[in-house]
Structure formats: structure tokens, C-alpha cells
């Protein structure tokens, strides 16, 4: 026996309006669930905080999203942690996020690169050592650094040629807040410097794979050489 109503869920990057789509739309109802944009996520997190009588500024919630990503379940878990720490009638501060929340490696790499752009070698090395101490695989750190510097290079090229940065980086609708962060950070590097760092990270990966160098030593050498 067929139920009177059936819910079909299709998970796709984009809704392709083919014959199946058109048929379903004709005889039923189509509802498209887009990924939430940062302002929508901020609004939901604010409601959660209000329910527990905890105050938080919008810019602090935006910082939480920058640090922890846009996955709603991750953000709810981190928000609950912050709510417990602040307590009823308390207030969540930016420094609470730095102390308590589990940051995405991409966010930490942003911090590391900020320090590199300002030639702060000690601070950059501290971020690297903290990642290693947190048991983050060094190979993953290398790959994330490489991808990050590639994005900064793409930003430089896009800005120089009056191209759209979001399109050049293939950012999703809920990642648009990253555009200004990338543009601001890219200003701290020359295009030639970014090319050189990217090449050095590629060379390090190759030398590591053939057993010529330790990854930790190689990363430290690249970071220190840039800041010198």
C-alpha cells in the first residue's frame, strides 16, 4: 500500500531541473533547503543564548562562526559550552571563544598567516607548535597551509585584474564573510612572496615523501626564513 504522501530528499550541490524534478514539482511540492548564511546562523545562535538568559553581541557570534565554521551542530555544541561558562545573566566574550572553543584548523592557519604577514616569527611558531601539541597531523598542517597560500595568491591575481574574489575562490553563499579576511591578509604579502612560499611548500612535500627531510623541521625552516 502506498502512503498518501511521500517525502523524497535529494542531496545535490544544485537542483537540476530535469524531467524528474519537473514531474515532482507538478504533482507535489518542491522545497529547496539552502545552506544558511552567516546572518541567519547568528540569529539562531542569539535565540539559543537568549533562551538561557545569556547575553552576547552579534560581532562575538560572527567571530565564533569565523573560528568554528558554519556547521550548525558544531556551533550549537560550542555555544552550549560558552553558555555554561558565562552562566545565567552572564555575557559571552570574544576571549571566551579563544579559551574554550575548538577552532577549525583553517581558522588557526589564518592566525598563523596573520603573524607571518606582520613578520612576527615567535607568534607564528607558537601557533604552529600549538597545532602540533594538539595532535594535528603535520601532513594536514602542510596541506592546509599550502591551500591557504594558494588562495591568497588567487586573491592577489583577482584584485590586480579586477576580478571577483568570491568567484576566484569558489566560495559558497555562507562563506562570503571570508572575502574581506582574505583580501586584508593578502595585502601583507607581495605576489612574488606568495609564489615563493607555495613553491617551497611543494618542495617540502616532495622531499618529505622521498625521505630527505622531516616535516616539522621543514615547516619551521620555511616560516623562519620568511620572517627573517
Per-range role (PLM):
Residues 108-111, 123-228:
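C-terminal alpha-helical interaction modules of replication/initiation AAA+ assemblies
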Residues 68-80, 121-124, 138-139, 194:
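The conserved phosphate-sensing helix
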Amino acid at each position: 500500500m502506498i502512503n498518501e504522501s511521500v517525502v523524497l530528499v535529494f542531496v545535490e550541490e544544485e537542483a537540476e531541473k530535469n524531467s524528474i524534478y519537473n514531474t515532482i514539482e507538478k504533482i507535489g511540492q518542491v522545497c529547496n533547503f539552502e545552506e544558511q548564511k552567516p546572518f541567519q546562523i547568528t540569529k539562531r545562535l542569539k535565540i539559543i543564548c537568549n533562551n538561557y538568559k545569556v547575553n552576547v553581541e552579534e560581532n562575538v557570534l560572527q567571530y565564533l562562526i569565523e573560528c568554528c565554521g558554519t556547521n550548525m551542530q558544531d556551533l550549537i555544541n560550542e555555544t552550549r559550552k560558552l553558555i555554561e561558562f558565562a552562566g545565567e545573566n552572564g555575557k559571552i566574550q570574544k576571549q571566551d571563544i579563544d579559551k574554550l572553543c575548538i577552532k577549525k584548523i583553517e581558522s588557526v592557519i589564518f592566525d598563523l598567516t596573520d603573524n607571518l604577514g606582520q613578520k612576527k616569527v615567535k607568534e607564528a611558531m607558537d601557533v604552529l607548535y600549538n597545532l602540533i601539541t594538539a595532535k594535528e597531523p603535520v601532513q594536514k598542517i602542510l596541506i592546509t597551509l599550502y591551500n591557504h597560500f594558494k588562495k591568497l595568491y588567487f586573491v592577489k591575481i583577482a584584485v590586480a585584474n579586477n576580478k571577483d574574489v568570491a568567484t576566484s575562490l569558489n566560495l559558497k553563499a555562507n562563506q562570503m564573510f571570508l572575502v574581506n579576511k582574505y583580501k586584508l591578509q593578502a595585502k601583507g604579502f607581495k605576489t612574488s612572496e606568495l609564489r615563493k612560499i607555495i613553491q617551497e611548500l611543494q618542495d617540502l612535500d616532495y622531499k618529505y615523501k622521498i625521505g630527505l627531510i622531516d616535516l616539522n623541521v621543514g615547516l619551521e625552516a620555511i616560516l623562519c626564513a620568511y620572517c627573517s
